[in-house]
């Protein structure tokens, strides 16, 4: 029996010695003569040896068994060709992050460190990494690198993935059902991000990409947070978020015109700088904290003529009760009744202006105020022809006494005559080529089939 145990110890000793001849982790680093630090955690108490590039193995101090917090920093100076080798068994935590101005890690091989649970390699120059042997990995943080692709299909225990600020265009997380936190911001992700196969994912940060669609699916996570700021989304469906009352959703800086929300009031909804209008914004009660102002400007034509009508009637209603005002580009207010009129959301321009815009405000959406006011794009109001002008349809308008005469009408032409206060004097469809309207002295807007002109009696 004694001989058996002696033999067993010899075998174990031989195996350990053999294991130590093969590095568990290898990395290629830039050589700048400065000290750099590696952070290591072991599954059981022990030591590691590190060859910093000169062929000599330096034994670390005793490293306690890793409990999630007690990893040990090991420092040295990279030399030679920058090939650093880490020897040791049961390495469960490893970090080789670099400083912004310091020397970087160029490549990293962890295929033999199969016990790894926590790997961090931020702010380096990694273009690829093989994780196919790291099936125990639970946390991967590898932001600020140059990765163009990554395969995490074998990392089925992964709960946290941070690959922020790389060059990635796509990622497959269908095999990562344990994933709770996903950080993929500042990449080049395009097309659709499908999260429907990960119903328990709790936090997703995918800001500053080129995503055109996101599929949430039925999300059952408690207190979920989703950030898709600064993408190219035009619509969004959040109806599958079960814990809506505690959900946070950021969609700022997209191209949204439509959003579907849970029936339950959300905790936070941010949709600033999208293409919503007063008519398409969600109700102000959809979230406890709802930030929607400013929005992208409402796009109108680049130019109008005096007498033309800008129809913004879609942006008002009995509920909205929208207030309209016109300003020059220097923010000087124009005078209603002199420079323009407003009637049911239709603005008629009365004077030529080099550059103006229209503001729209509603008590229902009170955050549209100050620099965050909802407004149109800029436009130019060009001078119109005189009283006896011939319109584009060949219609001639003239005045005499208290009568406005219109000739050259076609059967069925829609004719409206209104004063500058918006009061309609006449409204009819032509049944002959000539029409006459009696009115008191003053300024009027004559509109024919939507084209208008200012005249004076």
Question: Where on the chain are the PLM-derived regions?
Answer:
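Leucine-rich repeat domain C-terminal region
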Residues: 224-226, 230, 247-257, 263-311, ...
